[in-house]
A protein has these predicted regions:
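C-terminal nucleotide
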Residues: 1-64, 89, 93-124, 221-380, ...
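Glycine/serine-rich anion-binding loops at beta->alpha junctions
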Residues: 60-76, 155-171, 375-393
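Structural signature of FAD isoalloxazine-binding scaffolds in flavoprotein oxidoreductases
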Residues: 78-96, 216
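DPxDG-like acidic metal-binding loop motif
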Residues: 83-85, 162-182
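Beta-strand segments within the central parallel beta-sheet cores of soluble alpha/beta enzyme folds
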Residues: 101-103, 147-154, 184-196, 334-339, ...
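Glycine- and acidic-rich phosphate- and metal-coordinating loops
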Residues: 135-157
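Phosphate-handling active-site elements
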Residues: 140-148, 176-190, 396-409
């Protein structure tokens, strides 16, 4: 929704949007002044970067937390995930240049010619590829694209394990949907567009969980048995009422140069599925996999087989986690989270990159968190793994001590205490 920039700024200053911001950021309306100031700042950034605009729109897309189903999405499995109260926000306004111009704070300006939306090999692994791919996808759905200037600010740390890339894709999707689609596409479709752009234009074979959690919002369970029509169901749970805090621990490891590690997981799982007569593991009954185990080992190698064991088990765990949450059985839920974490490390092997000896940051983070929690709470690798973050569910009475202990090991600001955001991609 477009408004004049002075009107936006006055409304933000006067607290007109306080209730909306309180919902998005899981805080009281009286605590939203700093949130409103962020939106005023992106309006300033828009004008400083691109010059005067008569009107603009304001948008938000949250980071996400994966709660269950580690690397199950690309095998058409089940996941449990939620949106969190850190996000990317943007101000967007029309331009007359037939270009999509995107300025993210701290990055170079990215410009896409809307007359040229074909995928480019030399653009793979770049922001331009994601933008071009999303524009192409919306154009295919009937969007009448026109010039647009976008200024983005983020408090979703890159490589943080809460998926800054998915938040970016969803944010662009929300903007394009609001500005150019007469018949709006659904949050599910926005997620699918982001995944398609990342797969086809960016060149990364990601699953759909990250984009779906950011786009749909709140806590959801998703069944990807039919990827074109994933089944999305809300899961009503309030971790704070259960006495649990959600912490995301930044291990300090870098995602750089790990694309091959990530890509190997779906590739190896698909190789196992192929031996068993399927395309992905969801196509293959577990009993068939067991019967074909010797052949899978010969053709795919033992690491691929162990990864398949993980995917089957974690897929089943998601259903058990959802049932436990529905029943309010948090002890069982936490046991399942810990089981998933052990399986990821031992079978999926996405905690330590192959051959790394001196740098095993995610492993150290898990070990330290488990030591501080003892037999309480739960700890697991978070998201894609290898680098980035660890997830911990911490009893609230232990939170201050846990946070201080982890930051003494990892560094100040490395323990993020988050809340589940009730809404996904949003137009303010």
């Amino acid at each position: 929704m477009m408004k004049s920039i002075p009107v936006w700024k006055q409304e933000l200053s006067d607290g007109v949007h306080a209730a909306r911001l309180a919902s998005l950021y899981c805080c009281a309306p009286a605590e939203t002044a700093s949130k409103a100031a962020r939106y005023a700042a992106v309006l300033d950034g828009l004008e400083k970067t691109f010059g005067f605009h008569a009107e603009a729109g304001l948008y938000s897309a949250p980071g996400r937390t994966e709660i269950g189903g580690n690397h199950t999405d690309h095998q058409h499995g089940r996941v449990l995930a939620g949106s969190v109260n850190i996000d990317m926000i943007a101000a967007a306004a029309p331009n007359d240049k037939n270009q999509l111009r995107v300025q993210s704070e701290g990055y170079d300006l990215c410009v896409i010619d809307l007359n040229d939306l074909e995928a480019r090999k030399d653009e793979e692994n770049t922001t331009a590829a994601l933008l071009r791919g999303e524009c192409a996808a919306f154009a295919q759905r009937g969007a009448k694209l026109a010039g647009l200037d976008v200024y983005i600010s983020s408090n979703v740390p890159k490589g943080s394990g809460v998926s800054s890339s998915a938040a970016f894709e969803v944010l662009i999707g929300v903007i394009l949907n609001d500005c150019f689609m007469t018949e709006k596409v659904s949050p599910i479709a926005i997620a699918q567009i982001g995944q398609w752009a990342e797969n086809v234009y960016f060149g990364k074979p990601c699953g759909l969980m990250d984009q779906m959690a950011s786009s749909v919002g709140n806590i959801i369970t998703i069944d990807f048995a039919s990827p074109a029509k994933p089944v999305v169901e809300p899961v009503a749970v309030d971790f704070s009422k259960a006495g649990l805090a959600l912490c995301i621990l930044d291990s300090g490891a870098d995602h750089a140069d790990l694309t091959d590690e990530y890509a190997a997981i779906p590739a190896e799982c698909r190789a196992v599925a192929a031996v068993c007569g399927g395309e992905v593991l969801r196509d293959v009954p577990f009993e068939t996999f067991l019967a074909k185990l010797p052949e899978c080992r010969r053709q795919c190698g033992d690491r691929a087989v162990l990864r398949a064991f993980h995917v089957y088990a974690d897929n089943d765990r998601v259903a058990k986690q959802v049932a436990a949450l529905h029943d309010g059985d948090f002890d069982t839920f936490l046991c399942l989270v810990n089981e998933s974490g052990r399986s990821s490390w031992e079978y999926l092997q996405n905690v330590i990159p192959a051959g790394y000896k001196e740098h095993q940051e995610v492993g150290v983070t898990i070990a330290a968190a488990k030591h501080l929690l003892g037999d309480k709470g739960a700890v697991r690798v978070h998201g894609g793994g290898f680098a980035g973050t660890v997830q911990a569910f911490v009893p609230v009475e232990m939170l201050d001590e846990f946070k201080a202990g982890m930051e003494a090991i990892l560094g100040e600001g490395r323990c993020h205490v988050l809340s589940i955001r009730p809404e996904g991609g949003a137009v303010l």
